[in-house]
Structure formats: C-alpha cells, structure tokens
Amino acid sequence: HPRVRRLRQMCIRDRLIITGGPGTGKTTTINTIIKYFEEKGSEILLAAPTGRAAKRMTEATGHEAKTIHRLLELSGMPSDESTGVNFERNEDNPLEADVVIIDEMSMVDIFLMNSLLKAVVKPTRLILVGDADQLPSVGPGAVLKDIIKADVFNVVRLVKIFRQEEAGDIVTVSYTHLRAHET
C-alpha cells in the first residue's frame, strides 16, 4: 500500500517534523511511529516542553515521556550561554537512543531547541511533533515554523481532521490519514 510505504520512508529519515492542527492525528501518528520502532528493537525517548505536556504524552502513548529539561539533564552548573541554563546532555555527552520524539514543539524556544540539537547527534533520529499554526513559545523564536520554512527537516503535514474515538486500529488510521509532503 502506498501510504504504508510513505510512513516507512518517513521513519527512516534522521530529521522529521510532523505537523497538523487539532484532531489531525498527531498523537495517533506518534503511536504508530513508536510501534514501528519498537518492532525493530529501537531505543525510543519521548519528551515535551512542560510537565503537563509530558504527562499527556505519557498517557496518550503508554510510554514514559519527560520534560525536555529532564531529558537533557538540567545541570546546576552555570552556563556560558545567554540562556542561563546548562545541560549534562550535549554534543560531548549525547542522548543514547535510536529515536527521540518531541511533542508540542510550538512551545519550544530557540535556546531549548539549540540545546536539544546539540544532544541529539546522528545516527539518532529526531522527530518533532506539533502544530505550526499555534502561537509561538513565550521564549524567543517560532522554532517549529522557522524550521519548516528553513527546509532542513523533512516535513509531514497532517491535514484531515477526524475523531480518534471513531478510529479502529491506530495503525490503520495513521496509514489512512497520513499525507507526507517533503518541503
């Protein structure tokens, strides 16, 4: 099936954005991606910008999600960057995983994104999920929108709105409603 092939193709990319408005299947797609990588025996890390978003991600996926700060291991050491924060996980001590999935990316500012990119080095896959049309983070930058415009990540836009409770098998729903567009 062509949609199944597209989903597999998107999962082999090392940098991917999944974007769509409310009800378009972002969480369903995350669950499908998790299942795909679990079947391959991959180590998967999940995170979101806030404790509340991480808790929702944990509930929706059945897998532990952390805040990005916790994932990157916020350090008590002072930082020489303008952010005033320092993380244990960085280019010298990268995250140890095959796949890192970050949800609610519209809430991430440029400083946190910079730290995240330093800690996720190839061959680790980085999958960013969020609604590019949401209001940007309270910190500087509209990171998700800017990355999409910069054309440095592959982008999947989920456009069809559906109700999850009407969905049968979660994988079937993702395959059916996924429209991949590389920008």
Question: What are the functions of these language-model segments?
Answer:
Residues 18:
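Hydrophobic anchor at the beta1->P-loop junction of P-loop NTPases
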Residues 22:
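The conserved Walker
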Residues 25:
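Conserved glycine(s) of the Walker
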Residues 29:
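Hydrophobic positions on the alpha1 helix immediately C-terminal to the Walker A/P-loop
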Residues 43-48, 52-119, 160-161, 170-171:
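Conserved P-loop NTPase motor core of helicases/translocases
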Residues 98, 123-127:
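Loop/turn-to-beta-strand initiation segments
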Residues 133-179:
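Conserved helicase motor core of P-loop NTPases
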